[in-house]
């Protein structure tokens, strides 16, 4: 079946899929067809059917690549950013469009930091460790401290370690407080009060803690 799908032309695909319209197969057939076209770099064929189904994760990656390869670079770069800025690893099919996106200078320092933060918050430590390579040098100490208070929340109680009133420092403090509050709520409250004397926390972020 897979071989037969891969051999179908764009013109024949609707008829081929219609043969199985009373089964779950049409969507599966189209997904497989799209993946085969993307893997083969047949981008026009891919785009001809990309709106026919809700794309699988792998085909969503190919769709972003297809946009770039068929002339819609702005849409491709937007799609690549949306795919990259998640707290989990994407399929390898995303690698080419991610490389293109980075090569075009779209991975700035704040975007790299944002993905690192959401990965830590999702407890995806292995991914966070991988993402360190994309962080600007000035962000790396903050990344280490964020991971530290995530994995060992009591460290946020060491007030003298985090005296700088800087946005990323405030961010890691509040994350550490949130983690500490799960097991030691009274201590977390006391520590937060001490930090509030010297740090200008965003009221919305503070309320969410």
Report the location of each language-model feature.
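Alpha-helical solenoid repeat scaffolds
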Residues: 1-209
């Amino acid at each position: 079946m897979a071989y037969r799908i891969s051999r179908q032309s764009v013109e024949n695909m609707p008829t081929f899929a219609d043969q199985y319209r009373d089964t779950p197969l049409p969507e599966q057939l189209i997904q497989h067809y799209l993946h085969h076209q993307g893997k083969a770099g047949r981008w026009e064929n891919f785009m001809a059917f990309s709106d026919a189904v809700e794309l699988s994760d792998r085909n969503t990656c190919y769709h972003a690549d297809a946009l770039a390869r068929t002339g819609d670079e702005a849409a491709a770069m937007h799609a690549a950013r949306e795919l990259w800025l998640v707290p989990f690893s994407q399929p390898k099919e995303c690698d080419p469009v991610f490389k293109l996106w980075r090569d075009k200078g779209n991975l700035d320092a704040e975007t790299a930091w944002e993905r690192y933060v959401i990965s830590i918050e999702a407890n995806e430590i292995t991914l966070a460790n991988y993402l360190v390579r994309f962080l600007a040098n000035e962000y790396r100490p903050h990344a280490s401290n964020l991971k530290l208070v995530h994995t060992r929340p009591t460290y946020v109680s060491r007030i003298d370690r985090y005296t700088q009133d800087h946005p990323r420092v405030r961010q890691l403090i509040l994350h550490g407080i949130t983690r500490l509050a799960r097991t030691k709520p009274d201590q977390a409250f006391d520590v937060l009060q001490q930090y509030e004397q010297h740090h200008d926390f965003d009221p919305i972020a503070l309320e969410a803690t």
